Amino acid sequence: MSESHVKISRTIIRGTSPSTVRLESPVRELEDLLDLERDARVRSERNANELSIQLDTMTERLDELSGTSSQTQDAIRRKDMEIANVRKDLENANAAFETAEATLRRKHNTMISEISSEVENLQKQKGRAEKDKSQLMLEIDNVLGQLDGALKAKASAESKLEGLDSQLTRLKALTDDLQRQMADVNSAKSRLAAENFELVRVNQEYEAQVVNFSKTKSVLEGQLDDLKRAMDEDARNRLNLQTQLSSLQMDYDNLQARYEEEAEAAGNLRNQVAKFNADMAALKTRLERELMAKTEEFEELKRKLTVRITELEDIAEHERTRANNLEKTKVKLTIEIKDLQAENEALAAENGELTHRAKQAENLANELQRRVDEMTVEINTLNSANNALEGDNMRLKGQVGDLTDRIANLDRENRQLGDQLKETKSALRDANRRLTDLEALRSQLEADGDNLASALHDAEEALKELEVKYVASQNALNHLKSEMEQRLREKDEELENLRKSTTRTIEELTTTISEMEVRFKSDMSRLKKKYEATISELEVQLDVANKANASLNRENKALAQRVQELQTALEDERRAREAAESNLQVSERKRIALTSEVEEIRSQLELSDRARKNAESELNDANGRISELTMSVNTLTNDKRRLEGDIGVMQGDLDEAVNARKAAEDRADRLNAEVLRLADELRQEQENYKRAETLRKQLEIEIREITVKLEEAEAFATREGRRMVQKLQNRVRELEAELDGEIRRAKEAFASARKYERQFKELQTQSEDDKRMILELQDLLDKTQIKMKAYKRQLEEQEEVSQLTMSKYRKAQQQIEEAEHRADMAERTITIKRTIGGPGSRAVSVVREINSVSRGNRATSIM
């Protein structure tokens, strides 16, 4: 230390001052900082352009979503119109079924009454035939009786002919009714065939759409798997970060132990070193808390995604079961499905974009985390550099103490130095006041240090340049170079072991921080007591100097000129000290500026985290909409199945109608055959009547033949009567069976009506689901607008950051100019005093030592 002082003193005496060289390196460093600030401004402008591009894309998406909402509203209006049409069709079908049932009942009642009347007539005819038989048996004995019997037979045959004519007319009317029913059945068959063809076509369209939806679902499932893999990668990155943090903690513990060893050797100034270490430890713990918070956020996000996946699977299974009940609505939902398909494509594109943005946000978070780790390493490096500079500060303060002793010895030689000592006392008081101001400034710097992490992203390149500046400062401080190189080598060797555990050292770190805080407080109290003791000692020395000055006043008249020279030298020293203090203030302001920049970097990091969280929320919203689309696809699949079942039921109804038609045709054929048979019988009866006329003319000749014919007629009438009764009974049974069939068809019609009512209710629920989907789209639109506002706000904040950076650069440049001006003034003053010999040259060398040490400390603080 003494050799360096001698070297500096000799240099001053020779007239070669290195202040210019020392000032050039801070100027170059500030120019580098200016370049870095320009680069940061370019990056901020680039970020602003990117944010404006994102704002334009979000505006376009907002327009697309508004168009999609209008299309959805149109689809809902069309669906309401279709529901009204279905309701009208249902009412018309119910009315038609009721009228058809009433007419069928009336027809069956009339047919039953007619058949019963015919049976009664046949029974009456049978009775008449028996009476005729008895009369003919009586007329065998008497020809006249036979003639009367023949006349009665003629009358009965005529009445029978009239009955057969009336029966023929009734059968014709029944045939006409059956033909009309057959025509109605044919029309219903054609209508059902057309509906069947339409249902088949719609079914094919739905099958094609279901295939498309299945492909979309597979794509979305692949995206979900990608997200799961990304979450696993994030977990692995988190584990790597924890190992890195543990290794950094171990490095910090080693450095702390080394620092304590140096603090024991350093003496009273160890408290300040502990203070700076406490500040760095607080910053490190804050970064660790932020890292743990981010880790917990990643774990919570992973857990939420897992729960969401299970919920989506359950919802998908539930919606598959629900979809089986909605397949019958495919005919009226074709237009809506096309609209939904277009919306699905838009949502798929949006989902892809959101997934890409989420991946970008995750990459950005990983990059920021890596930068935080690099910043932590560089902060540790700067901490070690700060420790070295504090050692220099201790040595400089020791030199200041030596200079104070020299000043006291010089004051003892002259009584006029008492006033100078009083001024020195006031200067020391000012120094104490400045110390309190510096402590307040330190507290302010600590508060500003909390805002330092927000500017990490923009200060990445600046911190790399700081590392280069640190190397330059090592070159400037040659007496510290070997020690710093050794520490750097040790740090490089220890960096390989700084990545294993973090939970083991967190508690030790907290205890160390608390101990360092207690140590800092105790050191501050000791420093305060030391300065108070120094002040008291200076007061005692002042009294002694006053006494010595009173005794030396008589002896030092010849030294008056020398005292004046020493007084001027002391004034120069005071001015140099003030210049050093101003330089210290400049360096403190620069430190505050750098602290504010780090706080801005931290705020930008928080903004990026918020953007990542927003992207994750958008991804969750997109996943919810994907699940809703999956449910709608399953619903449409179930609608398809239900419509296929309805088609099968309608096909069965069509087969039944065809069978009924065939049965009606068979009945019509049987009735036609019966009409022909009755016509033949009528002709036979006419022939019998003619034969009876001929028999009446030949009664006397052919009595036996008439008897035989009468017996044959009796047998024929009995046989035909039995046959007619049996035939009519069969007809009654057939009509009863037809009545049962019509009743069954009426019940089926009522069942189909209830089925249509259920379909109507299902359509209502579907329309409500569509309305709910529209509300969700509106909420998504509102969220998008909020995000646009947030992006605009971030853009404004980036502009404010760039403006603050330029203002800081202007302030730094102004401070550099002021420092250069003060350095020039000091060099001119030293040049003036250089020609003075004797003790004056020694005072100038002392002043030069103080200036050189203070400027070296200022250059180190700037770096």
Swiss-Prot record:
Coiled-coil stretches are 27-836
Which Gene3D superfamilies does the record match to this protein?
1.20.5.340, 1.20.5.370, Vasodilator-stimulated phosphoprotein
UniProt keyword terms in alphabetical order: Coiled coil, Cytoplasm, Motor protein, Muscle protein, Myosin, Thick filament
What InterPro entries does the annotation carry? Myosin_tail (IPR002928), XRCC4-like_C (IPR014751)
Q: Name one GO cellular component term.
A: myosin complex
Q: Give the main location.
A: cytoplasm
Name any one Pfam family assigned in the record.
Myosin_tail_1
Q: What subcellular compartments does it reside in? A: Cytoplasm, Myofibril
Signal peptide range equals none
Residue segments, region Nonhelical region:
1-26, 837-863
Which family is this sequence assigned to? Belongs to the paramyosin family.
Q: How does it assemble?
A: Homodimer.
Q: What does this protein do?
A: Paramyosin is a major structural component of many thick filaments isolated from invertebrate muscles.
This protein's name: Paramyosin
Species this protein is from = Echinococcus granulosus (Hydatid tapeworm)
